[in-house]
């Protein structure tokens, strides 16, 4: 298929990569650093005494920050601390807010590297933020080919951003929120746009099945399977025309499936979230009519089952844990756990108890699930113990004292709120307005957490972004 010329301007790759300048030491620089020779005679040094490895996550983190990765005792200790660190990290995290200017509500986010996070907002802005400097680089959105196609809808936004397993491609929405846009990493050059015979309404969710196959879920009640041809990004197709304008292919889905209509709420079968099981090669989906759907995902989609969820209001987020073969669904007041292979679910739903503001984002890591609420807080639930993580009796992070019985909760800062007429007339000029945490993503090697969101009421304009480390 011949690529089509578009009106999107080329960005210099250096603009996006500039923020990652200190994230890793180049190979030649590392080699040069290790070839220095000492002046004067060589002395026979005494064998250094082996330091005692201190069994504390705090000491490990401090040692790693000082470059002690190869320190005796630390290398073996790192594996032992991995599971323990998952439990202790939440209580060690401290917030640093990031300034995003007048952008409206961060809906989606993913780490690109140790310093950069790519985000999508309600105001249809795709940008990369350097979490160290705070610098923001906007990424031009891809445009549909036909002049009669739907253009940007600023009230919709970019609801999904996903990286493929090898982190060489990024999938998100286009200028038309119905279209699937794919960019190459790390340069964020445009690769292709799924704007032909695809969705008729906004894309709410994206999941990668492999490095070249992605699935999108839409508000029109359909799930589409897309394949990205390697010729589109391996250099066999010219990137630009003579004017320097980037070219990208316009593709159509390889398969499309509509979710079944529910008898209880047939008009609200919008696909809200997707999660892929690599182990089982299955795709899970949540629709706003209160159902969970499961497909066998190969070269096409074959629906296996549809289940009525125990809590069916505002099912807006879904995640999957390969280790536990378990899906987690967030709703208005609960997180429900589903194992499609079990008739009787053994894990009871957890209640967020956050004033009915709902669960807005979920993520699994090992046996801990992180819950972002609509009331500006992060909660942490241990699946094995089937209880929330609790605060410690001592403020010292090195303490091994008992728990207080109080739920461990991280409360996010105020962010920025546009104090316009709507805010004054309908919300009484309330100064303290909690932010809904629509997205969060971990950088586990660096033990950092990025959180994004904004005010929960749809009419309010504002944003929140924070780095927890």
UniProtKB/Swiss-Prot annotation:
WD repeats lie at residues 153-193, 198-236, 266-305, 354-391. The keyword Ion transport does not apply. It holds the Pfam family Beta-prop_DCAF12. Keywords: Repeat, WD repeat. Residues 1-34 are annotated as: Disordered. It comes from the Eukaryota. Belongs to the WD repeat DCAF12 family. This is DDB1- and CUL4-associated factor 12-like protein 2. The gene is Dcaf12l2.
């Amino acid at each position: 298929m011949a690529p089509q010329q578009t009106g999107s301007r080329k960005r210099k790759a250096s603009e996006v990569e500039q923020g990652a300048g200190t994230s890793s030491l180049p190979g030649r620089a590392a080699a040069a650093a290790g070839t220095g020779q000492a002046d004067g005679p060589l002395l026979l040094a005494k064998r250094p005494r082996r330091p005692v490895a201190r069994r504390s996550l705090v000491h490990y983190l401090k040692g790693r920050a000082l470059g002690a990765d190869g320190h005796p005792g630390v290398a073996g200790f790192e594996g032992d601390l991995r599971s323990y660190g998952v439990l202790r990290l939440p209580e060690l995290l401290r917030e640093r807010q990031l300034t995003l200017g007048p952008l409206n509500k961060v809906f989606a986010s993913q780490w690109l590297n140790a310093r950069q996070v790519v985000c999508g907002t309600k105001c249809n802005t795709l940008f990369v933020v350097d979490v160290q400097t705070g610098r923001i680089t906007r990424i031009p959105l891809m445009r549909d080919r036909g002049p009669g196609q739907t253009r940007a809808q600023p009230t919709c936004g970019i609801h999904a951003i996903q990286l493929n397993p090898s982190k060489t491609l990024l999938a998100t929405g286009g200028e038309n929120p119905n279209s699937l846009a794919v960019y190459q990493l790390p340069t964020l050059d445009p690769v292709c746009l799924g704007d032909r015979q695809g969705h008729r309404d906004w894309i709410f969710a994206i999941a990668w099945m492999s490095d070249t196959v992605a699935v999108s879920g839409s508000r029109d009640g359909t799930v589409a399977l897309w394949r990205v041809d390697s010729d589109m990004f391996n250099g066999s197709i010219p990137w630009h025309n003579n004017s320097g304008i980037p070219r990208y292919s316009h593709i159509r889905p390889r398969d499309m499936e509509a979710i079944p209509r529910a008898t209880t709420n047939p008009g609200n079968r919008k696909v809200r979230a997707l999660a892929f099981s690599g182990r089982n090669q299955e795709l899970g989906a949540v629709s706003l009519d209160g159902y969970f759907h499961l497909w066998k995902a190969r070269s096409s989609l074959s629906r296996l089952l549809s289940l009525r969820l125990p809590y069916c209001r505002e099912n807006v987020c879904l995640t999957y844990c390969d280790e536990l073969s378990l899906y987690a669904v967030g709703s208005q007041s609960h997180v429900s756990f589903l194992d499609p292979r079990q008739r009787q679910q053994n894990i009871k739903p957890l209640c967020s108890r956050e004033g009915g503001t709902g669960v807005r984002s979920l993520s699994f890591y090992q046996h801990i699930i992180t819950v972002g609420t609509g009331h500006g807080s992060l909660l942490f639930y241990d699946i094995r113990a089937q209880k929330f993580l609790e605060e410690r009796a001592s403020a010292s992070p090195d303490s091994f004292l008992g728990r207080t019985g109080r739920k461990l909760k991280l409360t996010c800062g105020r962010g920025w709120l546009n104090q316009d007429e709507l805010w004054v007339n309908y919300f009484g000029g309330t100064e303290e307005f909690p932010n809904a945490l629509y997205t969060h993503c971990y950088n586990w090697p660096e033990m950092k957490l990025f959180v994004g969101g904004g005010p929960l009421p749809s009419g309010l304009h504002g944003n929140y972004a924070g780095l927890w480390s």
